[in-house]
Amino acid sequence: MPIKAVRRTVFAISAGVAFAFALLPSTTPASAADGTETIVLIRHGEKPPQGLGQLNCQGLNRSLRLPAVVKARFGVPAAIFAPNPADQKTDQGEAYDYVRSLATVEPTAIAFGLPVNAGIGVEDISKLQARLEDKAYANALVLVAWEHKQLVKLARKLMKDHDGDPDSVPKWQGDDFDGIYVVKLSRKGGDTAATFARQAQGLNGQPATCPN
């Protein structure tokens, strides 16, 4: 076959292959990130009257029973977040390192063999939100243990920013250590829709004495 004819044949085959690939459905970063992220928000456990930035024995007992609740209700998290324990919080007029939330979620992290992301300040909700909105968690379960007023701010902001109703997120009562706020972010084709639901751990009434 003459060289020119060979070249024409090769060109025709190459053009045909390129056309065939062009007809295939494309996989874009947006489609790769489609899915539903479940963000489970829990408050720290019960605290002593003086605050101390710490849990009391009842809060400790709650934290020890939390892993079973999380696994049965939601499954095993892909990531766990708690505020930076080096941040100080004022309790009864005294400033203490704020370890309550981390102490609450630490048994869960240990039970599941997970690290705790604890590098964000307790009031830096914008930074926490940005981490939670990372497309790496598009199909993931994420557990967040935090201060209850900041959790309400976070949940309302997530709802507002993702086509949800921020007013659907109620105030978190000061005596409620059992609540679970669940925000789901459903991503599809570059759009994100948020939904909210409130649940309960079912762990009230734990012993007021610490385990031996």
Task: Set out the residue ranges of the language-model regions.
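Bacterial N-terminal signal peptides
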Residues: 12-23
